[in-house]
Each structure stands twice: as C-alpha cells, then as structure tokens.
Regions:
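Short loop/turn motifs at secondary-structure junctions
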Residues: 2-3, 49
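Sec-dependent N-terminal signal peptides
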Residues: 3-13
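Glycan-recognition and catalytic cores of secretory/periplasmic carbohydrate-active enzymes
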Residues: 17-322
Length: 322
C-alpha cells in the first residue's frame, strides 16, 4: 500500500494545485482487488512443462497457437513485475512464485552469454528465435523491469547479480559517451559490433525500468548522475523539439540526435510519460526546469491530444500535421 501513497504524495507535491477527486486516488486500497484479479489471470498463462509465460493469449487466457507459442523477453519481465507488485499489495505468496518462474526462464534462456545482452524472443522450449537479430534498447531496458522489482521485494542477491549484469551490458554496449551526443543508442547488432540511433524508448524507458529503481535502492551517485543525464536528454531533445511540432515531440533520432524525419509519429502516452519521469526525478533531484517542462508536456496532451467529451488522451498523432 505504501507505494500507492508515495506516488500520490509525489503527484500532489509536483502539481500542488490539483485536488484529486477519483475515489481510487483518494483511497488507493480500492485498486487492490483489481490488481489481484489481473495477476490471477496471468497465472494461467504459465507453461508448467517447459517454464516461462506465453506471449500470445486471448482474452480468456488461451494460447493463440496460430500466432506462435513464443515467450518473449519482455513478457517474462513485465509478468514478473506485475506479479511482484501484486504480491506486495496482497501478500499472496503464489504471485511471488510466479514472478520467480518468469525470471528463472529469462535467466536460463534469454541471456546471450557469448555476446552480452538479452534475446528478444524465445520459443516454447527455451531456444532463442532469430538469435542474430538486432538488439534494441527497448528490450535491454525492459528486461530489467521485473528483475528490479523482484530484488526490491526480496533482496535476493542472485537477482541483484542479473540486474547489474544487464545494466552493465547496456552501459558497455549502448551508452554513447560523446559529450555532444551522450545517451543510449537505440539499437545494435547481435554482437554489438555496430550501434546506432537515439530514441524516446532508449531514453525514457531507461528511467522507468531500471535507473530510477537502482538509485532508490542504492542511493549511489552513479545512478543519480545517470538520471540527470537522461533528464537532460529529455529536456534538450524530446521536450526541446516540441516548439517546432504541431503536437508532441520528435521520437526517433539519428545517432547525433538530429531528427529522423522518416518517422513522424508521436504518441501521447510517451509525451505524458516524459513529463511523469521529469516529475519523479524532480522529487529526488529538484530542478525547476524539470517541473516547467513536465507541466508543458502534460498541457500539450491535454490541450491538443485529449478527448474532452469521453475522457482520456488519444494515442497516435502525426507530429507534423497534427
């Protein structure tokens, strides 16, 4: 429960003029039955024969065999994250066991030992599908989401080892140390012989999946400084591109942060997430620039990408044409 209350305090402190009215914000415990129900559904997707959780399932929890029986990396990590949070809210030990199953499958089958980094997709039997495919920052970051949550809940040193192994792999292979273009590259070849591009995913998803959690868990200045660098990337490049767009910001970049104008889609959830991350970082490393940018990002969605009749933000826009 305390994590919900901490989140509400963060929101109220960052945007003090807002008075929550939702019953789920006023009493976060109301959300626990929903979390319990969601987690219970996904327990049925576990493969008790070969381990891991299927990726392609229908609304009833049946595997959609025609789509493939693959068990994608981020399915395992996100399932582990969800199960851990459900355990922390409900105390249901079975959810922690399910999270353990997901991570054990990842550790056994999704890590590329010869080259470092995580494979994108695994077949039912634990073999990597297309092991020489590109490795993306999106996958490398999200692989750490469930591991970090499990370590937070249990302090299991084995999971810490895998968490740091994954983090160091991204630092060694995806981080661009150039003072003029620092940031995470968006993708690399399977053996990391070539890396390229920058993106929203490579930048902002690093915060939510691992860097923020690592700083909260350790207080280590290594992760604090990384948060500052990623916040600078948001301010300089994502937020910095907003004034020249009809809506949203540039999401795809060349390696030197020049815009990739072959991709003009902007996603409202990404704009909101960037503001959310700046707000979270501001709670730990106060900077008025973070708050000002967060307010502008949220206002852009509310003013230009929000359904004021039925509620909720729209999803995708062309940033140039609106």
């Amino acid at each position: 429960m305390k994590y919900f209350y901490i989140f509400i305090l963060i929101i109220n402190a960052t945007f003090a003029q807002y008075v929550p009215r939702s019953p789920y914000l006023l009493d976060p415990s109301k959300a626990i039955p929903y979390v319990d129900s969601c987690a219970d559904f996904w327990t049925g997707v576990y493969d008790s024969t070969f381990g891991g959780f299927y990726t392609n399932v229908d609304r009833y929890g049946n595997v959609i065999v025609s789509w493939g029986t693959n068990k994608d990396l981020i399915t395992q990590s996100r399932d582990a994250y969800g199960f851990v949070r459900a355990y922390m809210l409900t105390g249901n030990q079975n959810y922690l066991t399910m999270a353990r199953h997901a991570l054990d499958f990842m550790y056994a089958h999704a890590w590329d030992s010869p080259h470092d980094g995580w494979y994108h997709s695994i077949d039912r039997f634990g073999n990597p599908i297309n092991p020489t495919d590109v490795k993306t920052a999106f996958d490398q970051h999200y692989a750490l989401l469930g591991i970090a949550a499990y370590y937070e809940a249990t302090r299991d040193t084995n999971d810490w080892t895998h968490l740091i192994q994954g983090y160091n792999s991204s630092e060694n292979h995806l981080w661009d140390n150039d003072p003029q273009s620092f940031g995470y590259f968006d993708n690399g070849t399977y053996d990391w012989s070539y890396v390229s591009d920058k993106s929203f995913n490579a930048t902002v998803d690093a915060i939510t999946t691992n860097v923020l959690e690592l700083y909260l868990l350790t207080g280590d200045n290594v992760y604090k400084n990384k948060l500052i660098q990623l916040a600078d990337n948001i301010l300089t490049h994502l937020y910095g591109s907003m004034s020249q767009q009809t809506i949203g910001f540039v999401e795809e970049y060349q390696s030197d942060w020049s815009w990739n104008n072959n991709e003009t889609m902007t996603i409202m959830g990404h704009v909101l997430k960037s503001g959310w991350c700046l707000g979270r970082i501001n709670q730990l490393i106060p900077d008025p620039a973070y708050v000002n940018a967060a307010e502008d990002l949220i206002a852009d969605v509310y003013n230009n990408g929000y359904d004021h009749e039925l509620g909720g933000p729209y999803k995708d826009f062309n940033r140039v044409t609106g």
